[in-house]
Regions:
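P-loop NTPase nucleotide-binding core
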Residues: 1-161
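The catalytic "switch" region of P-loop NTPases
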Residues: 112-223
Length: 223
């Protein structure tokens, strides 16, 4: 019962780049999220709605409250806050949790526009911090510099939403090997190394990454 996603690395989608290639990789990964119930990608909104629905069901089942009761929304909001607060200690977790709370607020009040804004932010589609601050009250946007931290946050979140974890499949890693600039290759290799070290040191909980690469790219000592 995992959330899975994939990306095919290319000239336009890398770990690091000076033309938004890292953010493009992130956007593709979020766009390609899939679950058993939504196998054809685009599962992010389903995951969020399932999370909210599960918390609402807990309030119904264990507290005997029903939607429309004067304290029903209060109890669900408390559960939402408990989960989002638990993410604040992670890098960028405060803003991530705040956007999740905004999505729930939109669900609770019927404000579809607020939900769309939260989804836009989670998908890495905000271009300026000013716009994000105005729309969602957060001081951060997902960017080339921090996108991988948000993949780790998503891995934590999907477990809280009832899944076993997040699997990320990355194909065509040889694209990095083919970068003509030595500096560009090294930046991308260093990012790959940091991802590997996170896994080795237990800093990327509930996240599995599968990478495919050609034998030539693995064994060429010159690159």
């Amino acid at each position: 019962n995992f959330v899975v996603t994939d990306v095919e690395l290319s000239v336009d989608k890398r770990f690091v780049g000076n033309k938004g290639q890292g953010l493009a990789t992130y956007k593709e990964l979020i766009r390609n999220m899939a679950t058993h119930a939504c196998p054809d990608n685009g599962a992010l909104q389903l995951i969020l709605d399932k999370w909210i629905g599960a918390l609402e069901n807990e309030v119904v089942q264990y507290e005997g409250l029903v939607p429309g009761h004067e304290v029903f929304d209060v109890r669900v909001s408390q559960k939402i806050y408990k989960i989002t607060s638990s993410m604040e200690e992670r890098v960028n977790g405060f803003d991530f949790g705040k956007v999740l709370a905004s999505y729930y607020k939109g669900h609770r009040t019927g404000d579809m526009e607020l939900q769309k804004k939260a989804l836009r932010w989670l998908c890495g589609e905000y271009r300026t911090r000013t716009e994000a601050k105005t729309d969602l009250g957060v001081n951060l946007i997902i960017s080339d510099d921090n996108w991988y931290e948000f993949i780790k946050l998503f891995a934590d979140f999907v477990v809280k939403a009832g899944y076993a974890g997040l699997y990320v499949c990355m194909d065509e890693l040889a694209t990095l090997y083919e970068i003509p600039s030595r500096v560009g290759r090294e930046y991308n290799y260093n990012k790959l190394l940091s991802i590997y070290n996170d896994a080795l040191q237990g800093k990327a909980s509930h996240l599995g990454i599968i990478i495919s690469v050609t034998k030539e790219a693995m064994e060429d000592p010159a690159r």
